[in-house]
Amino acid sequence: MPFDRPGLTMRPIEADELPAFGAFIQGVFLSDVHDDEIELDRRLVEPARTLAVFDTSGSGAPISNRSTPVASTAIFSRELTVPGGPIPAAAVTAVAVAPTHRRQGLLAAMMRRQLDELHDTSQEAVAILWASEAAIYGRFGYGAACRANHLDIASRQTRVRSEFGRSGQVTVCPADEAAPFLRAVYEQVRHLRAGHLDRKGPWWDARLFDPQWRRDGASSLRFAVHHVGPPSSSGDAYAVYSVKGTWDATGPQGVVSIREVQASTPAGAVAIWAFLLEMDLVSHVRWDRAATDEPVQYLVDNPRAIRQTSVDSLWVRLVDVDRALAARVYAAPVDVVIEVSDPFCAWNVGRYRLTGDQTGAHCTPTSSDADLAVSVGALGAAYLGGTSLTSLAAAGLVTERRPGALAAASSAFFAARPPSCPEVF
């Protein structure tokens, strides 16, 4: 659908417009712009996959410079792990509208063009995003497919249970020494855990970006690696964290803030969590984006010392239902006809026969009677295997047309572990 708004134009940015693009986004998100962040953006942003709306009317624009956007969005080309392994995903980011131009339909227009182009060019079958506000993206067909737990652990009130034996050694090392271990462990984990993203090119630099202005009085990032043998041996777990020392009248009240913990073995999880919880001078260990099944809650002797707050994290949009459903595997054999409603992307409306198992899947349009009726947003929520179709049906978001079809399909969509996305993009 062409963008036809008097005085406004929508187009991808040019490479030399990136500083203004980045400054605009930071301003909308209530932050200042920093040169080091713009330099990182130069390595991450693909100008051809951006969209910006420019006010050319001379009225209402934030400044006289017409190269400053009034609305923006972009796509990062990433790999998303789904049940069965990684697939290409359009990682939607930088969605912003200037306060001078809100409530004018600019967000909907950008979402429309973005999804139309993905479909028309047969690019990624799946789009993903983190929602700044959870009420925004459902109307564009996104569903909340992952949840994360905010953890606040009173570390003096609990410890890893004594029956969990410890082997190997945890070492704290500089970033350059830790890097190969972090990369190796993460690659093992991300291929197996739905919701994880690849970190090719500059994405490790983005994940470990640690400017002084972000630290809020805490230390620089520190790196702990668990080695299965001596420090020169391979690693199977790591923690990336910062520390902030504070004292009150009773003594030290330091805080460990976790950026990321990954473990490819149970022994690694035991060792790295014991290290974090037993740190001297620390009263709390906090993590904003832990997996909902993070092992620490099962390892400690006093789980009530862990305060957990569950929040939505990764949202999934099936751009092309047939291609997306065929791109993952299924935990149990499935043969079901799904009737899909999609008010925003009419090409998805219809019935599809999905057949598949743990080795692969096929999904094709059909005229057969539907076994299930579901919205594209509900399918997005179920896509990574963390939200069951039966739970969505209990909320009225899935309708069973053939008895038994719901239970069978729900079992097939299931993932052995809930999906987790450890990084915001």
What are these regions (language model features)?
Residues G60-S72, A90, S232-A239, V256:
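Glycine-rich phosphate/pyrophosphate-binding loop shared by adenosine-nucleotide-utilizing enzymes
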